[in-house]
Amino acid sequence: MTPADLADAIVAAIGRAVADGDLDVTVPTTVTVERPKTAGHGDYASPVALQLAKAARRKPREVAEVLAGRLATQSGIASVDIAGPGFLNFTLAGDALGEIARTVVRAGESYGHAAKPRGVRVNLEFVSANPTGPVTLASARWAAVGDALARILTAAGFSVGGEYYVNDAGVQIERFGASVLAAAAGREIPAEGYHGAYVAEIAAAVLAGRPDLLDLPEDAALAVTTEEGLALMLTEIRSTLEGFGVHFDRWASERALHTAGALTKAIDDLRAQGHVYDADGAVWLRTTDFGDDKDRPLVKSDGQPTYFCADAAYYRDKRGRGFDQLIYLLGADHHGYVARLKAISACFGDDPATNLDVIIGQLVTLSRGGAPVKMSKRAGTFLTLHDLVDAVGVDAARYSLVRSSLDSSLDLDLDLVTRQTSDNPVFYVQYAHARISSLLRNAEALGLPTASETADVALLTHPREVDLLRGLGEFPRVIEAAASLRGPHRVARYLEELAGVYHRFYDACRVLPQGDEEAGPLTGARLLLVAATRVVLANGLGLLGVSAPERM
């Protein structure tokens, strides 16, 4: 019985108590189940009675007594005790904890995933870097975290659409085209333009396809370098991200919104709802009505739409495509966007608390030997995803970028993340999987079943076995927490803890017989436990987009 199973049993018991007239509360969809904070207080605990007491207009211990009576006879539960003000402490039946191993192996790749779809469509926008240069190190973090979050949300039962918003309209694109043209003509690139070897490479590629480029009038040549340079840069960005294992369901074009008249339609909708006004020759949105520090212009006095107007049109476009929740993963320099996006959501009649989630991430730096790594040879003034992958590989890069909370800055030690020692987290987790795979290959060579349906899991009573079983049982709740709190790092930290628990189990509990020993029932039970651990490690690494090697 996993914590998720126990939570379901508690919810069912609440439902029965309500149906019987013993409790007058709204039946929750889920409840908290955790390990007891004090040893000897059972296998799991729940504060559900304390949480329901106010709504039930009963003392917590009275609510606990109502639930304990219904749960004590539940299959897999040996006893239910009431502690303190009303905590429920559960002791599982002899084989109930061991059954977790069998549950994991039976479920395989689906273990930890939601049993059924939630019926909620989520749009997850991430990276969305300007297509004016290679994918930067900061964008690499959003790529790793965003892709992992998409996988985790999918596992948690959401229907997820990953999206890259291409900022292919505006001044920065004009400057990029001018920079490529200057490089092609052998002229000095404007100070406000884009610099670095990659600009010269793109210019050479454009020239190769258009040898007549420099014979064209300046405006025509600029149009060519802008369009073809943009296409080449986008091709490189796509290739880089695909090589990093990052998938997008849609590449959305800002320019396409302009062309389709989406900005005008957004303004019309907002005006019809009374949130738009005209002043000083410009068109404004009353964002201060919804928590912004000042109203924002949609159209400037020169008649040109603002970036904010495009943001509003893009929000409307996403909701119009049927997405229930919109998640924006933005960089540290976008703090000001939070209030603006919430105001946009509210102006369109949505509830920002329900329909919108803006996640702000902090920056990444690299170091080697204690010294900062400051510059890319190709990009010139900034580090790129390509630089990072070249230095450490895809697995180490993705894992290292994901394992820390986004709200903290990240300094990646290139020496550490390539070290094959236990102080390197990605090696530590991957090595646990490889170590298990080696053990299971040896078991198969001895003719031993590695996932026997008849294994006697009631024999798994050693403290290290119990710790490992409890750890495996936590995985579904870890996925749920990582999804609801938008924190893929929770999966990484869980895997590191699980790997440590496994290594301690391996050191304390011999799995395979040695010498002339005969394999007994305990061998089969431990092999099932080991196989279950491999499933969870592989599933968890897969959610982070990291491989689970069979050999290291």
Curated annotation (Swiss-Prot):
<protein>
    <recommendedName>
        <fullName>Arginine--tRNA ligase</fullName>
        <ecNumber>6.1.1.19</ecNumber>
    </recommendedName>
</protein>
<dbReference type="InterPro" id="IPR001278">
    <property type="entry name" value="Arg-tRNA-ligase"/>
</dbReference>
<dbReference type="InterPro" id="IPR008909">
    <property type="entry name" value="DALR_anticod-bd"/>
</dbReference>
<dbReference type="GO" id="GO:0005737">
    <property type="term" value="C:cytoplasm"/>
</dbReference>
<dbReference type="GO" id="GO:0004814">
    <property type="term" value="F:arginine-tRNA ligase activity"/>
</dbReference>
<dbReference type="GO" id="GO:0006420">
    <property type="term" value="P:arginyl-tRNA aminoacylation"/>
</dbReference>
<dbReference type="GO" id="GO:0005524">
    <property type="term" value="F:ATP binding"/>
</dbReference>
<comment type="similarity">
    <text>Belongs to the class-I aminoacyl-tRNA synthetase family.</text>
</comment>
<dbReference type="InterPro" id="IPR014729">
    <property type="entry name" value="Rossmann-like_a/b/a_fold"/>
</dbReference>
<feature type="short sequence motif" description="'HIGH' region">
    <location>
        <begin position="129"/>
        <end position="139"/>
    </location>
</feature>
<dbReference type="InterPro" id="IPR009080">
    <property type="entry name" value="tRNAsynth_Ia_anticodon-bd"/>
</dbReference>
<dbReference type="InterPro" id="IPR005148">
    <property type="entry name" value="Arg-tRNA-synth_N"/>
</dbReference>
<keyword id="KW-0436">Ligase</keyword>
<dbReference type="Pfam" id="PF03485">
    <property type="entry name" value="Arg_tRNA_synt_N"/>
</dbReference>
<dbReference type="Pfam" id="PF05746">
    <property type="entry name" value="DALR_1"/>
</dbReference>
<keyword id="KW-0547">Nucleotide-binding</keyword>
<keyword id="KW-0648">Protein biosynthesis</keyword>
<keyword id="KW-0030">Aminoacyl-tRNA synthetase</keyword>
<dbReference type="InterPro" id="IPR035684">
    <property type="entry name" value="ArgRS_core"/>
</dbReference>
<keyword id="KW-0067">ATP-binding</keyword>
<dbReference type="InterPro" id="IPR036695">
    <property type="entry name" value="Arg-tRNA-synth_N_sf"/>
</dbReference>
<dbReference type="Pfam" id="PF00750">
    <property type="entry name" value="tRNA-synt_1d"/>
</dbReference>
<comment type="subunit">
    <text>Monomer.</text>
</comment>
<keyword id="KW-0963">Cytoplasm</keyword>
